[in-house]
């Protein structure tokens, strides 16, 4: 309900968030425009990211529309969450964040970027390879470490955010990004598994703390 997506032509896809923004304003809460590669089906699309990142005109259109909506709706800045980009898009993604940050700053906002929970520069996997911690840290004002989802719906029973795993991510991150820029992601949910767990069959039920403000 809160994510802004975009088309392959670089046009911003806006959610129906008027009620949520009004509520935030009533409570004096600052808001960020959340920009992601999520599709209408709820999946992250590397194809949409690639089309935008490799075309300067499409990229400029998306940046212009994002900043305009940020100003029109009173957002304090932009929060970017592009996932599963792969190694080939890492450099162009960081360059996009740099361009977006310049436009956002000119309009008086801040830029935040979410990054996958890496523990090394060369960590394999499309989720990790598209995020260059050092380059993203230089571009963004704040960087959110997505330190959660080790335990997930179709995986084996385990903590969503194991302390030892989170610690390894933080130790790596502070060596690549200025510590004062870092934010630690903390899950407001858990999973309930049916036991015994059967790989490929067991599906955990998500438990959400809906009373948390």
Task: Locate each region found by the language model.
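Aromatic-lined carbohydrate-binding surfaces of glycoside hydrolases
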Residues: 7, 35-53, 78-89, 115-120, ...
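Append "and occasionally in soluble cytosolic enzymes with long acidic Gly/Pro-rich linkers
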Residues: 32, 67-71, 210-213
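Substrate-binding surface in catalytic domains of secreted glycosidases
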Residues: 8-18, 90-212
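Surface-exposed charge patches
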Residues: 22, 68, 102
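Glycan-recognition patch characteristic of GH18 chitinases/ENGases
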Residues: 1-65
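Short, acidic/polar
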Residues: 55-72, 125-134
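Active-site groove signature of glycoside hydrolases
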Residues: 61-92, 142-156
